[in-house]
Regions:
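Short, charged, surface-exposed loops that flank catalytic or proteolytic processing sites
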Residues: 110-118
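Activation on terminal intrinsically disordered regulatory regions flanking enzyme cores
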Residues: 136-158
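Short amphipathic alpha-helical segments
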Residues: 28-30, 102-105, 151-152
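A generic local secondary-structure boundary/capping motif
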Residues: 3-5, 12-14, 52-55, 78-80, ...
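Conserved beta-strand-loop-short alpha-helix elements that form
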Residues: 17-22, 63-72, 82-108, 123-129, ...
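Short, surface-exposed beta-strand-loop junctions and turns on beta-sheet-rich folds
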Residues: 21-23, 31-32, 40, 97
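Conserved, helical-rich catalytic subdomain that frames metal- and/or nucleotide-binding sites
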Residues: 36-85, 148, 154
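Conserved catalytic micro-motifs used in adenylation/nucleotidyl-transfer and phosphoryl/amide-
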Residues: 1-26, 33
């Protein structure tokens, strides 16, 4: 089992992940992968044994080096990323990114659709291409925090 998770806190997202589930951020039309896969292929890319293109074409994409449930404990990679208004955060299982290219993900996230429609389109596209694995997709869009208008806010403004 793999995991990608996020917690919004103080104008930031705290991202955690294990395995090859991913987190992406779309900001002003640019998609950024926020996580690094815990996989044999990623390790081979990192040390220069294969290229990212060779990894994408490999039949060994699902050999993870870290997963939930294998050992009693597992190391969760955690990082903090800033959040701006209108940023979109995508959490997904490898069933999505194995079948849909990052450029296509960015195009769908940038489309003028509801978040639910974007999720449906991403899952649908992965399934159209064979959907060999389970496909989990969550999209969150950042908004401006509400203005504080209570009594304490009025006192603190003085």
């Amino acid at each position: 089992t793999t995991l990608a998770m996020a917690v919004a806190h103080g104008g930031k997202f705290v991202i955690g992940h294990v395995g090859d589930s991913r987190a992406y951020r779309l900001r002003e039309g640019v998609l950024e992968q926020l996580t690094r896969d815990h996989s044999l292929l990623q390790e081979q890319v990192d040390i220069g044994l294969i290229t990212p293109e060779e990894a994408a074409a490999s039949g060994n994409r699902n050999l993870v080096t870290r997963a939930l449930g294998v050992e009693d404990t597992v190391l969760l990679d955690v990082r903090e990323v800033d959040v701006l208004c209108d940023d979109q955060l995508l959490l997904c299982s490898d069933g999505l990114n194995d079948m849909v290219r990052d450029e296509e993900i960015a195009e769908i996230l940038a489309a003028d659709l509801t978040l639910d429609a974007k999720c449906q389109r991403l899952v649908g596209l992965a399934n159209e291409r064979g959907g060999r694995d389970n496909i989990s997709v969550v999209i969150v869009k950042a908004h401006e925090p509400p203005k504080k208008s209570g009594m304490m806010a009025k006192l603190l403004r003085k």
